[in-house]
Amino acid sequence: MAKQEDQFKNVISHAKEYGYVFQSSEIYDGLSAVYDYAQNGVELKKNLRDYWWKAMVQMHDNIVGLDASIFMHPTTWKASGHVDAFNDPLIDNKDSKKRYRADVLIEDYVAKYDDKIEKEVKKAAKRFGDAFDKVQFLETNPRVLGYKAKGADILARMGKSLEQEDLADVKSLIEELGIACPLSGSKNWTDVKQFNLMFGTKLGASAEHATDLYLRPETAQGIFVNFLNVQKTGRMKIPFGIAQTGKAFRNEIVARQFIFRQREFEQMEMQFFVRPGTQKEWYETWKTSRLKWHISLGLGVDNYRFHDHDKLAHYADA
């Protein structure tokens, strides 16, 4: 873990030193989780975006592009569920005054079981040498199976509590696991509360007559509200796709990991519309297709794996 953190720090240092990424407004002490792409970074991002656009749009007859605006009618976000469901469960430590995502605290705790499993694997590999079968070991070793079961039980309980909006049980789980504040070591927690991730703003010349708006938290809704327009004017027949790239904004309270978790970021997204009942088939087709595209970037096959989420977005079923 320490080695990975050192490597991550080296990447950040390299990105700044060689003109790829700068801290935004750095001369004024910067702004947390907001970054500027520098002279080399902007070219790298443009090349990647152009390559994605060519592969996703220009090489498919049944996929077209779109450039929707950042501002949308506020009813859009009510209808999509973002106003009511686009939330993070947050918890404060009373002693450090630090705020955390409750689910991340629990997931970080479960990750310790993965570290323990890795230690068991290393010990066994050293003990058995060339005869060591890692797959069989992971499937049969009692300690490993015990760690897996504990982690799975914790995540299952958390997932059920969040799904049922039982935030009291999420706090109870944190207390039962003895999770402490990473900063202070204190276990003195507040209740868990939901926090909406959308940035709000106003449209209008005066405050009393202004309309509440949001900076879009994703590009997908611009595609959905233009579905009929694109279908009619482009004479598109299902199955077909609509793609776009553009800025999105999320008021991340726990923003970390450099450019991998920002409050302002760019998305490259394609929504593919299919007939009901065929979504699983198309899902697998696109999983295979997109993996080939990622591998074509030359970063190595071993650096990619599919991760099936236990906790899905409020609008997803896979």
Which residues does each PLM region occupy?
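TRNA-recognition modules of translation machinery and tRNA-sensing kinases, especially anticodon-binding
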Residues: A2-A318
